[in-house]
Design a protein with these regions (language model features):
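Short, well-ordered loop/turn elements at secondary-structure boundaries
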Residues: 1, 39-40
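N-terminal beta-hairpin/loop module of FHA
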Residues: 1-31, 86-88
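Residue-level detector of flexible, active-site-proximal loop/helix-junction positions
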Residues: 10-13, 52, 60
Length: 103
């Protein structure tokens, strides 16, 4: 699986994690706020117990508050909010290099 930890000063939780620094002058994003991972054609997000929380706004407008430690499946065009920052998920269709991985 591909995985990245996002935050103001993220720390890896596994040896092969990628780290994505989120610039946030207001410090609404925790140091290691959230994990995003892609495996077997699916993309998941997990909040690490951040101070200001995270949520997902689906394309239909429905918002789901993330619970610390619970992995949530993302869909294309979902908008993920971390603190006062947000980003939109764009899932690319094509060959999934992790399709042959075992659980």
């Amino acid at each position: 699986p591909l995985a990245a930890n996002l935050g103001r000063a993220p720390v890896a939780s596994a040896h092969d994690d990628r780290l994505i620094i989120v610039t946030d002058p207001d410090a609404s994003v925790s140091k290691t706020h959230l994990r995003i991972e892609h495996s077997r054609g699916r993309t998941w997000v997990t909040d690490f117990g951040s101070t200001n929380g995270s949520d997902i706004r689906a394309d239909d407008g429905q918002t789901t508050e993330l619970v610390a430690g619970e992995r949530v499946l993302l869909d294309d065009a979902d908008r993920v909010r971390i603190g006062n920052r947000s980003f939109t998920i764009s899932l690319l269709l094509g060959t999934d290099s992790s399709a042959g991985e075992r659980a």
